[in-house]
Amino acid sequence: MIWHVQNENFILDSTRIFMKAFHLLLFDGSFIFPECILIFGLILLLMIDSTSDQKDIPWLYFISSTSLVMSITALLFRWREEPMISFSGNFQTNNFNEIFQFLILLCSTLCIPLSVEYIECTEMAITEFLLFVLTATLGGMFLCGANDLITIFVAPECFSLCSYLLSGYTKKDVRSNEATMKYLLMGGASSSILVHGFSWLYGSSGGEIELQEIVNGLINTQMYNSPGISIALIFITVGIGFKLSLAPSHQWTPDVYEGSPTPVVAFLSVTSKVAASASATRIFDIPFYFSSNEWHLLLEILAILSMILGNLIAITQTSMKRMLAYSSIGQIGYVIIGIIVGDSNGGYASMITYMLFYISMNLGTFACIVLFGLRTGTDNIRDYAGLYTKDPFLALSLALCLLSLGGLPPLAGFFGKLHLFWCGWQAGLYFLVSIGLLTSVVSIYYYLKIIKLLMTGRKQEITPHVRNYRGSPLRSNNSIELSMIVCVIASTILGISMNPIIAIAQDTLF
């Protein structure tokens, strides 16, 4: 008798939960239509994989890419609509969130063709790889639109769990296993620190979890200048600093970059920074509105450390992926300038513009590294010597992307940094901008050092890897070259036509 009562209660509770979920999707589902497209793509992937054979592998790539393109299209149709809050205040749709979601989808769309040949050569499991990439993309999109502390914590964990699995995807590689372990342990620690900061914010605001309601709660409780808010700020900054690879929370980055499969590194190097930047902007600007001087100072210190350490240590690296890891630490220091400047002086617009340029520059560089690695089996910078004599197209593409990362005119990286630094200078961040300019000069040195190696024609400097260089026999290499060409063109010409991009970025609102 007792068992029957408990069973009936369980069925009733389950029915209520299901009906509530159905009600939310029915009335609020239109607000997450781009995300629903990705979810449908994930289900379709699993269905095809469970009912098909090896001949249907191209369909898996097609479904993944089509889902991402359709999601981008849905986002573009929703552009300029009125800001809306849905799912009982958990999710917000506005232009600011959507432009970051667009950047994440763009990253994933370019990363899938970049991965095709690598997966075939290394015989990695295709369905699981695409599943993790799409799920991580979904987590990043939900993070961009998150409007409460719970969603801001759960969404990046969805992204992080997929990132841990992707970084250790080549299970037989010892370096990949080491990278996964370090990433998992430090990621878990940073998440604990982040949620501890959220608990202080929750308690200080009188039990509020929505970002705007936290501000109102702090006013009502008169806790906006309390020590609890300072403690929350420190813990949250440390947690977000890990996600952004800000110094001194950057130690995991070089090892994960070096040990993970190269297409995975390409994916993580841009999507994680885009999603974390969107989240950081809203967290610092809304709940910590009354502590703007404190978080400005804190972020300035971290940005200076990142720019100096990242670019100086990058000079000493012998691995291309480790060099790009330290370079990315320096690059995120430049992005922080836009977050500190804020919306009043065009800081957010300059940050978004530079993020778009960084995606093209970074993914273009990684596409070149994937191609070179598949054809030579090496990642050592020294082994790139003389590549121009064997593959001029690949060498020139890599050189253009590196020059753009360094910020040399007339490439996109130059105009992106120029606008970012100019906004910082107008906002009075003279010391921070000066450090940014000096470290940019340092970065040009190690990029030019690689380009000099690429173009060398002296036989004694050319290593056996380039001497025995061969083109890939696989027909799928066109997909990598397609991603590479798109990124190289974007890295070259986007800067010239950046005024429309800035105008679109300035149209973003919270």
Curated annotation (Swiss-Prot):
Pfam families: Ndh2_N (PF19530), Proton_antipo_M (PF00361). Belongs to the complex I subunit 2 family. Its main location: plastid. Keywords: Chloroplast, Membrane, NAD, NADP, Plastid, Plastoquinone, Quinone, Thylakoid, Translocase, Transmembrane, Transmembrane helix, Transport. PANTHER family: NADH DEHYDROGENASE (PTHR22773). The keyword Thylakoid applies. NDH is composed of at least 16 different subunits, 5 of which are encoded in the nucleus. InterPro entries: NADH-Q_OxRdtase_suN/2, ND/Mrp_TM, Ndh2_N. The keyword Transcription does not apply. Its EC number is 7.1.1.-. The chain crosses the membrane at residues 24-44, 57-77, 99-119, 124-144, 149-169, 183-203, 227-247, 295-315, 323-343, 354-374, 395-415, 418-438, 484-504. It comes from the Eukaryota. GO terms for biological process: ATP synthesis coupled electron transport; photosynthesis, light reaction. GO terms for cellular component: chloroplast thylakoid membrane. This is NAD(P)H-quinone oxidoreductase subunit 2 A, chloroplastic. It is a multi-pass membrane protein. It is found in: Plastid, Chloroplast thylakoid membrane. NDH shuttles electrons from NAD(P)H:plastoquinone, via FMN and iron-sulfur (Fe-S) centers, to quinones in the photosynthetic chain and possibly in a chloroplast respiratory chain. The immediate electron acceptor for the enzyme in this species is believed to be plastoquinone. Couples the redox reaction to proton translocation, and thus conserves the redox energy in a proton gradient. The gene is ndhB1. It catalyses: a plastoquinone + NADH + (n+1) H(+)(in) = a plastoquinol + NAD(+) + n H(+)(out); a plastoquinone + NADPH + (n+1) H(+)(in) = a plastoquinol + NADP(+) + n H(+)(out). GO terms for molecular function: NADH dehydrogenase (ubiquinone) activity; quinone binding.
